[in-house]
Design a protein with these regions (language model features):
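AMP-binding/adenylate-forming catalytic core of the ANL superfamily
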Residues: 112, 119, 231, 236-237, ...
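Conserved adenylate-forming
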Residues: 5-18, 23-68
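Glycine-centered tight turns that cap/initiate beta-strands
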Residues: 19, 141, 165, 201, ...
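Conserved AMP-binding/adenylate-forming
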Residues: 93, 144-148, 152-171, 175-272, ...
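Conserved helix-loop-beta element of the AMP-binding
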Residues: 62-65, 91, 117-121, 134-155
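Short hydrophobic/charged patches on amphipathic alpha-helices used for structural packing
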Residues: 12, 104-108, 136, 295
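Conserved AMP-binding/adenylation subdomain of ANL enzymes
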Residues: 44-63, 73-117, 132
Length: 446
């Protein structure tokens, strides 16, 4: 204590903007997580820019609820460094966040007790809160909630605002962009379904690229393209050097533009709209199907709590759309009911799911995002098993794995060597790397 000046800490360490501050795993919804390296400069810049955007909505006298787990950038930044840097209070909702025992069930009680003004969550949280009555709790301190990490179904968006009266600010960001890149303004016009306006000093645009991923031109207003970002918040790169290929686009302006892998458009007023993820597109016989074209209508069904659309491998069409559905507690619907509903709601015939699968629980990541790779692996195993049986190689044991790039590889174990020629013919019709082995034969005793 004696060596300190009395007004500031005399820290021997001098932190530079380029020094590494954190190593965060990416969300991992399209494959295995990668470790993103972010500098002190990245995080300070993002907190400052977001703070300027939110203004007095987050500041002295305000209380933020941190409900996402602390290993997630939203918790560390939006409900962490951002409110701390603005002089706001932060209430931690257990180290496990919303997954902590009783946190969601007692959410409205927590809001009332701590006079929460702001919270942040993923779409699955808002869907869960719709099933928790707020009756009897005084929650008028709550000004708005932020939604990011995954697109918010419009049906959930409307239902939550109508039921609670709480404004939702939908935003967009990535671990690679520190956290926040765009968000609907807290005091300006909020556009339903939009991911909002870019925050200060965040360069962001939609661009057209060729088949090799090279930049061709900027998109016109409302033209869909690949979203790219540049600015002081954009990370250094991934820890593993081999994962840094094709991260950056050269737009000819000397800036480092990060390829987000997301598809979107920017309207004439500067509001961005997320239209899908390039890697999640379902390609059925040449038709590019955005999973949202299936998921949005399903979320409008009164019995549906969560829905996820993926592509099922098909030797003829490439992929066939399949919908997974998790029903609301106490609600009932059959696959036939949901199929009939979608026939009325989905105009694009190619987008109608070939199958609807009602499951007890859709797999989620640690922060509550729908984890589609698990569903994709499940469909791939089922499709290949059926194709092998039809092609003369029944009873195969199939293991599907996902590599760092999100690609799949298949290991097939056959019951006898004579099935291998037929199996190779069948597997050769699918765009997967595969290996074939023969199950060990039991030793016969004489």
């Amino acid at each position: 204590m004696a060596r300190e000046s009395g007004t500031v800490l005399d820290n021997v360490r001098r932190i530079q903007p380029g020094d590494m501050s954190s190593f965060f795993c990416t969300g991992g919804t399209t494959g295995l997580p990668k470790i993103a390296m972010r500098s002190h400069g990245n995080e300070v810049a993002n907190a400052w820019s977001a703070g300027r955007f939110f203004g007095d909505s987050i500041g002295p006298g305000k209380t933020t609820f941190c409900g996402l787990p602390l290993f997630h950038v939203n918790a560390a930044m939006v409900t962490g460094l951002l409110p701390f840097s603005r002089g706001a209070h932060v209430v931690l909702g257990t180290p496990q966040g919303y997954r902590g025992d009783g946190v969601v069930k007692r959410f409205w009680e927590i809001v009332e007790h701590h006079h929460i003004n702001f919270f942040s969550g993923v779409p699955t949280l808002y869907a869960s809160l719709l099933d928790i009555p707020a009756d009897g709790h005084v929650i008028d301190s709550l000004e708005y909630g932020l939604c990011g990490a995954a697109p918010m179904p419009v049906g959930v968006f409307r239902a939550f605002q109508e039921k609670t009266g709480i404004r939702i600010l939908e935003g967009y960001g990535l671990t690679e962009g520190t956290c926040v890149s765009s968000v609907n303004p807290p005091t300006g016009e909020r556009r339903l379904g939009s991911i909002g306006l870019r925050i200060p000093f965040q360069a962001m645009k939609a661009v057209i690229v060729d088949d090799a991923g090279r930049y061709l031109r900027d998109c016109a207003a409302n033209e869909e393209g690949l979203l790219v970002i540049s600015g002081p918040n954009v990370f250094t790169g991934y820890l593993r050097a081999d994962q840094n290929n094709a991260l950056w686009l050269d737009l000819g302006d000397g800036k480092r533009w990060f390829n987000t892998g997301d598809l979107g458009r920017c309207d004439v007023d500067g509001y961005f709209w997320l239209t899908g993820r390039k890697k999640e597109l379902i390609i059925r016989g040449g038709h590019n199907i955005d999973p949202a074209a299936i998921e949005e209508p399903l979320h409008r069904h009164p019995a549906v709590q969560l829905a996820a659309a993926i592509g099922r491998p098909d030797a003829h069409a490439g992929e066939l759309p399949v919908a997974y559905v998790q029903l609301k507690p106490g609600m009932g619907a059959t696959e036939h009911d949901l199929t009939a509903f979608m026939q009325q709601e989905i105009a694009e015939r190619a987008a109608l799911p070939k199958h609807v699968r009602i499951v007890e629980a859709i797999p989620l990541t640690g922060v509550g995002k729908i984890f589609k790779p698990e569903l994709k692996r499940r469909e791939t195993r089922d499709a290949l098993r059926a194709a092998l049986a039809q092609g003369g190689a029944p009873g195969a044991s199939i293991d599907v794995t996902t590599d760092q790039s999100g690609g799949m590889s298949v290991s097939v174990e056959l019951s006898e060597p004579g099935l291998e020629p037929a199996a190779r013919v069948v597997l050769g019709r699918f765009p997967f790397a595969f290996s074939i082995s023969i199950a060990a034969q039991p030793t016969r005793s004489s």
